[in-house]
A protein has these predicted regions:
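Key DNA-contact positions within bacterial/archaeal DNA-binding proteins
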Residues: 40
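Alpha-helical residues within the helix-turn-helix
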Residues: 33, 50-51
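Basic amphipathic alpha-helical segments that dock to polyanions
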Residues: 17, 45-50
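Non-DNA-binding regulatory cores of transcription-related proteins
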Residues: 68-132
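Short alpha-helical segments that sit at the start of domains
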Residues: 1-13
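A short alpha-helical element within helix-turn-helix/winged-helix DNA-binding domains
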Residues: 25-36
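Beta-hairpin "wing" of winged helix-turn-helix
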Residues: 52-68
Length: 132
């Protein structure tokens, strides 16, 4: 499994917000500067997190982004799936004349995806931010 660049940007921003720990909204230009990310790409990465209910986007002069729940209650699986979609064990393309082999490989890939989902579900945003 490989995370998209957008997912990486989202994780950088979420870790920053979690490390702040005060629950106050942080403006996107500040997050972008702190993490060395283009603000345009940052907003693109944060929009699906707002839709998924992981972030709140607050308008106005003192607005910005803040976590919708405590960092201890947000798993990496939620973040990855909000950005990149479900973690799956798909195999690209079919193997010529290898139906049985393809079936066995599919089982291996699905097992690996199950392990990845389980592990991502165990790790919390607070773990990335070094907060408990």
């Amino acid at each position: 499994m490989m995370l998209s660049r957008t997912c990486g940007y989202a994780l950088l921003a979420l870790e920053y917000l979690a490390a702040q720990g005060d629950g106050q909204p942080v403006a996107s230009p500040l997050i972008a500067r702190a993490r060395g990310i283009s603000e345009r790409f940052l907003v693109k990465a944060l929009t699906p997190l707002v839709r998924a209910g992981l972030l709140l986007s607050l308008k106005g002069p003192s607005g910005g982004y803040r976590l919708a729940r405590p960092a201890t209650k947000i798993s990496l699986l939620e973040v990855v799936e909000a950005i990149d979609g479900p973690v799956r064990g798909d195999m690209p393309g079919a193997l010529e004349g290898g139906d049985r082999l393809e079936s066995r490989l599919h089982a291996v890939c699905e097992g690996a995806a199950d392990l990845m989902r389980r592990r991502l579900g165990q790790v919390r945003l607070s773990d990335l931010a070094g907060k408990k």
